[in-house]
Amino acid sequence: MANCALILKISLAMLAFAANSILCRLALQGGHIDPLSFSSLRLASGALVLSPFLFYHAKTTLSLWRPLSGFYLMVYAVLFSVAYIHLDTGAGALLLFGAVQFAMVIHGLFKGESLSVMRACGLVIALAGIAALLLPGAKAPPLYSALMMIVAGLAWAAYSVRGRAGQAAGASTAANFVLATPMALALSLLFMKQGHYDAAGIALSLLSGAAASAGAYVLWYTLLPSLGSITASTLQLSVPCLAMLGVWYSWMNH
C-alpha cells in the first residue's frame, strides 16, 4: 500500500512537471505573454497559493527561509521561460531534464550513492538525447536557448538537492516561492519595455504557478528525502516523454 502511494505521488509530480513545459510553451508560442512576465506571475501565484503553509508553521518559519533555494528557483523559472521562446516542448524538456539527470547523478556519486546499470542507462540516454539535439548537422535548436535551458536544469537540480534536507515540505516550498518572486519581478521591471501580455497569457501563467507548480513542488519536496539524488534524477527522465505525449494528444484533438 505504501509503495502504491509512493508511485502515485511520483506519477502526479512527473505529470505536473510535463504540464509546466506544455503550459509555458503554449503561453509563449502564440505571443500571449513575455517570458519574464510569465515567470513572475507563475512564481507569485504559487507563493499566494502556498502562503497558508507559512502561517501554519509560523513558529518554525524562520529556519525555512533559505535564500539560496529561492535564488535557484528563480533562475530555473526565468531561464526555463526565456529558453522556451525558441524551443519546442519535447526538446526543451529533454535539455532541461537531461541536465538535471547529469547534475544529480554527479552529486549522488560524490555522496556515495551507487550507480546501477539501469541508472547508468538513464544517464547515457539523457546525454545522448542532448548530443543528438546539439551536434552539428542535427536539427538543432538555437544554441543560446539550448544553453539557457541547460542552466535552468542545473538550477533545478540544485533546488532539488537542497530539498532533500527534509524540512516541512509545504512551508519550505512556500518560502522559496516568496523569495523567488521579487527577484523575478525585478528582472521583469528591468525589461518592462519588452513586456506584453493578454488574457490567455495571464491565465496560462496563473495555471502554471497555482496548479502545475505550487502543488507539484510541495509534492516533490515531500518525496525527495526518501529518494537518492540518482533515483530522483532518473525519475525525471519520464518528463520529456510525457510532455511530448501531451503535445501529440493535443495535436490529434485539433
Regions found by a protein language model. Name each.
Residues 37-48, 81-114, 152, 230-249:
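Specific alpha-helical transmembrane segments that line the substrate/conduction pathway
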Residues 78, 92-99, 163-181, 210-249:
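Helix-helix packing/entry segments at the starts of transmembrane helices
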Residues 1-37, 71, 78-79, 128, ...:
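Glycine-/small-residue-enriched transmembrane alpha-helix faces in small-molecule transporters
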Residues 17-21, 46, 69-77, 81, ...:
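Transmembrane alpha-helical core positions of polytopic small-molecule transporters
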Residues 10-11, 62-72, 113-126, 145-146, ...:
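Cytoplasmic-side transmembrane-helix entry/capping segments in multi-pass membrane proteins
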Residues 14, 50, 103-105, 138-191, ...:
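Transmembrane alpha-helical segments that form core, pore/gating elements
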